[in-house]
Amino acid sequence: MIGVERVQTGIRIEKRLLKVLKGLAELKDLSVGDLLEGVVLHAFEGKTAFSKETLAQIAELKKIYRLTLRAGDSHQLRERP
């Protein structure tokens, strides 16, 4: 184990995306924070964070929560008034 110092943060995130993240975290027995740390650390190194099996689980969660957003949509999202 590597010792780290974590801080509490408040972020705003798209509602359906959060539902998918929470569902995946539960499937993997992780906190959402641990899941996000892993995804970001993999992305920083240009690596995929997920196996084919996990990607299939994500696809199912996206269907369940009607998440249609894709990578190309990032940085273009605007909150509804």
Q: Where are the language model's segments positioned?
A:
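Generic low-polarity alpha-helical segments
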Residues: M1-G3, K47, A59
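Short interaction-prone segments
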Residues: A49-T68
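Short, basic amphipathic alpha-helical segments that act as recognition/interaction helices
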Residues: K28-L55
